[in-house]
Amino acid sequence: MAESRSPDRGAKEDKPRPRNISREESLQLEGYKHACHALLHAPSQAKLFDRVPIRRVLLMMMRFDGRLGFPGGFVDTRDISLEEGLKRELEEELGPALATVEVTEDDYRSSQVREHPQKCVTHFYIKELKLEEIERIEAEAVNAKDHGLEVMGLIRVPLYTLRDRVGGLPAFLCNNFIGNSKSQLLYALRSLKLLREDQIQEVLKASHRLQY
């Protein structure tokens, strides 16, 4: 049966899509690179314009190539564990505040494998922090090794939709995302129960209308 079209696929839906794979199975693959990325998030009581709840801070970043993605990078699993490699990448991209943040196997959420344009497994982690920790990461990110080079800056994901029904998350999803980071973001919204499925579908439809 042919798959139905979905608004979040965009123009690239005809390209081979990554498939889900278990962490254990992925580590048995030969000839594949491994990349680990993490969503750092924290609850927030703030309100935009004193009326629109922020609810939760989710961090993404603007990359050197002009695309949005999550912090992290490639890990050589021959030398270190996925989590050790991710920790190193986070410190390089986000700075000294990450020295006290431990990302463990308990924070692991999913893995996907793709064959094109290169054989690669992407591993996704979700780590909850305190708002004060997120704010410290944001403040100290300018001192990171990769700031201004591989990382152009940190970005908070707007979880709300404004009265015009396109401002906020629908407009945010119109950005250019690297690899499967957009699907990882949508996965996180579902996994953390930040939006109901009907709300996610409405956001995707609004975002699709903005693009087309």
UniProtKB/Swiss-Prot annotation:
The cofactor remark states: Binds 3 or 4 divalent metal cations. Acts specifically on U8 snoRNA with magnesium as cofactor. Has broad substrate specificity with bound manganese or cobalt (in vitro).
Where, in this chain's numbering, is Mn(2+) 3 bound? E89, E93, E150
How is activity affected by pH?
Optimum pH is 8.5-9.
Chief place where the protein resides:
nucleus
Q: Give the GO terms filed under biological process for this record.
A: dITP catabolic process; mRNA catabolic process; NAD-cap decapping; negative regulation of rRNA processing; positive regulation of cell cycle process; sno(s)RNA catabolic process
Q: Where in the cell is it found?
A: Nucleus; Nucleus, Nucleolus; Nucleus, Nucleoplasm; Cytoplasm
Q: Which Pfam families match?
A: Nudt16-like
What changing E92Q does, per the record, is:
Reduced activity; no effect on RNA-binding
List the cysteine pairs that form cystine: none
Q: Which PANTHER family match?
A: NUDIX T16 FAMILY MEMBER (PTHR31699), U8 SNORNA-DECAPPING ENZYME (PTHR31699:SF1)
What is the recorded name of this protein? Answer: U8 snoRNA-decapping enzyme
Q: Which organism is it from?
A: Xenopus laevis (African clawed frog)
